[in-house]
Amino acid sequence: MRHQWVANRRGQSNVSQMHYARQGQITEEMDYVAKRENLPADLIREEVARGRMIIPANVNHVNLEPMAIGIASKCKVNANIGASPNSSNIEEELDKLRLAVKYGADTVMDLSTGGGNLDEIRTAIINESSVPIGTVPIYQALESVHGNIENLTADDFLHIIDKHAQQGVDYQTIHAGILIEHLPLVRDRITGIVSRGGGILARWMLHHHKQNPLYTRFNDVIEIFKKHDVSFSLGDSLRPGCTHDASDDAQLAELKTLGQLTRRAWEHDVQVMVEGPGHVPMDQIEFNVRKQMEECSEAPFYVLGPLVTDIAPGYDHITSAIGAAMAGWYGTAMLCYVTPKEHLGLPDAEDVRNGLIAYKIAAHAADIARHRPGARDRDDQLSEARYNFDWNRQFELSLDPERAREYHDETLPADIYKTAEFCSMCGPKFCPMQTKVDADALTELEKFLAKDQVGSAR
């Protein structure tokens, strides 16, 4: 749908949405987002210009349906997919992509580290996807030197970053905030550095005793991004990997650097969102969101979870959705889903489904809590259908219609039960929703109560 839109921008040195927004121009992407969000187009332009909203939309991803990530828009959900050296292939990843989009992923990150030709996998995903695609280019940079971290150079990183930009990746996680002086701060952690990208750079800095090359060459990354309109997703290399490590000096030192990098990118009209933790106890979530807004000048916050406890392997889509709902309520713009396989293995299609639904619930709950216009409309419609025993309408309005119908069918599969005024929980005689309160009866009751109060007053 974007062929003509981007064709009109050919030859321009900066094609970022922020660049146009700061020139006072409402692009086709901004107008499209305004309709999707039911917000004024000029508000979208103002938020993008200010840096509080991004529209990740690489000019080379022409089949993209533009969307927004920011505090003024609905809370979004990202799904991670990706092949590994031990599992998965192109077709399996495309199936995961389709499933993720089906169940409401607003963006998808390809975190492939193996399983075939990474360029082919990425190209296939971009060509198939109508939602923005994000990547972590450091993974392919490491693969390009056959896993020998010490052999990586700054040019290796930039080559892969540029390749991803040319292929149409809409946003890239760039781990530029971890500095060599931050490394001693992880000494007292239980889980050290849990970011894969952060771990790679930490080992590189420890080996060479040199500063993070993504930090020293940050302006070169900016130049690549503004040519293709790639958004920064500034990686939190020192995010806490357990609740013990949350909000520590290492995490906050990197966050301060991420704020400085955000403003450097903005000087060149390049869009930025900032990644966040991780594992955070419930009582620290508000602090983390507020601190990010303060340090990063209100750039959109994109958090992984956070998990609020560490004792539930196999159920971390639940432990993290609790934290995600709270983070969304406090103002986080996008939530990165966690699947039941987190910390245990590579998720399959069913894990993707379960993780996504858990996070769509969290994001929707956050939108309701933030009183976004129209956020509760679907809830009210489903409640009306429930009260009227309109089972098919309930299924239709559910986040996962297939699962809702499946559970109802387990005990009452016949079509006749789709109009029944009960379910298998209460049966035909005990359902409280059968007690329909007649409006006329309520009016008569009010008259009686009014008379009774008068009599009591005497």
UniProtKB/Swiss-Prot annotation:
Binding site for Zn(2+): H279, H343
Binding site for [4Fe-4S] cluster: C423, C426, C431
Keyword Glycosyltransferase: no
Record keywords, A-Z: 4Fe-4S, Iron, Iron-sulfur, Lyase, Metal-binding, S-adenosyl-L-methionine, Thiamine biosynthesis, Zinc
Pathway: Cofactor biosynthesis; thiamine diphosphate biosynthesis
EC numbers for this chain: 4.1.99.17
Record carries keyword Metal-binding: yes
Enzyme class: lyase
Catalytic activity: 5-amino-1-(5-phospho-beta-D-ribosyl)imidazole + S-adenosyl-L-methionine = 4-amino-2-methyl-5-(phosphooxymethyl)pyrimidine + CO + 5'-deoxyadenosine + formate + L-methionine + 3 H(+)
Pfam families: ThiC_Rad_SAM
GO cellular component assignments: cytosol
One GO MF term attached to the UniProt entry: carbon-carbon lyase activity
Swiss-Prot/TrEMBL cofactor(s): [4Fe-4S] cluster
One GO BP annotation of this record: thiamine biosynthetic process
Family, as annotated: Belongs to the ThiC family.
Cited function: Catalyzes the synthesis of the hydroxymethylpyrimidine phosphate (HMP-P) moiety of thiamine from aminoimidazole ribotide (AIR) in a radical S-adenosyl-L-methionine (SAM)-dependent reaction.
Protein name, UniProt field: Phosphomethylpyrimidine synthase
Organism ancestry: Bacteria, Bacillati, Cyanobacteriota, Cyanophyceae, Acaryochloridales
